[in-house]
Each structure stands twice: as C-alpha cells, then as structure tokens.
Amino acid sequence: MKLIDAPRCPYCARARIVVAEKGIEIERVEVDLSNRPQWLVDLNPPRGRVPVLDNGFTLPESEVIMAYFEERYPEPALLPDDLTERARARLLLYRFDENLGDDYYAFRRGDDNDLVGKLESLEVGQSLFADIAYVPWVIRARDMLGVELPARIADWLANLEERPSIAAEVELVRSL
C-alpha cells in the first residue's frame, strides 16, 4: 500500500496524521508539486492531485482516504461511537471549505479577508476525526503564514500537539 504525498500539502497532512494515529504501515511516495510527474497525472487525472492511496486500486481525495482508513482500520477509532456525533464530525469535514479552506487560501494569496475570525469560529475539540481534518491548515496558518491564532484555537492546537502524529506534522511544516 502506497500513499502518494507532498510534504507541503495540508490535504496530504490529513492522510499522514491518520496513518500515524492508526499505526498503519505504508510506503510514502513524496512528489514535488512544482514539478508534478506525469505518472501522477496518469494515476489521478486530470490534474494529478494528492494525496492518492494506491492499494491495488486508486483512491484520491483526503476525505475519502480518511474514511477508508477509519473503516479499514477501526482501532483506534477516530470517529465518536455515537451515531449522531459521527454524523456531526462528518458534517464538519463536509463544510471545511466554507468553514476555513476558502479563507485560508484567499489569505495565502494576499486577499483581504477575516481568516482570524474564521479560525475563531471553528467548531473544534468535538471529534478527533474532524480535528485532524482542520489542524493541517491551522498549523500552516500559524507557522507558514504568521497568523496569530485566537486563544481558544491556540489552546486547542497546543493540546493536539501533545499527540505524536500532530507533533510530527508541526515539525515537518517548520522544516519546509
């Protein structure tokens, strides 16, 4: 089983964190997105986006990979046991772009927006699954874009950084 991955990519970070949380043995194949290889475009057409799981079949998209790993490797569980809470966690992931993604990328491009306000309004700490979906962007906002995190979000991130999977992602981001 291979995970096609790019260190800078927060979507890939989701998959890396889940792999670490679940202790999955996997071969990571790192690609340089500024020089995207043709084999990646062929594997995941039309643009060759990452992450991609190659396990005898091709599975793109971080949300789908996260869900696949959660079902394939049920322990330790990242989703809550309660059906309603699991649905809420999935809803947070479904609404990612609306809740954070669009504003993060606009801020990164230099557009005037309220990224700090979006960060402040995040619903975090309810589900590790949803937290894993959001934390790569929060780490990058702080460590790559120099955003001062709202106190509640900084505290949430500090708690998550105690997890080896998140600490490893912070270390990776700081090395870029």
Placement of each model-derived feature along the sequence:
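GST-like fold's C-terminal all-alpha helical module
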Residues: 84, 92-165
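A local structural micro-motif
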Residues: 27, 150, 168-169
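GST-like domain detector, emphasizing the conserved glutathione-binding G-site
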Residues: 1-123
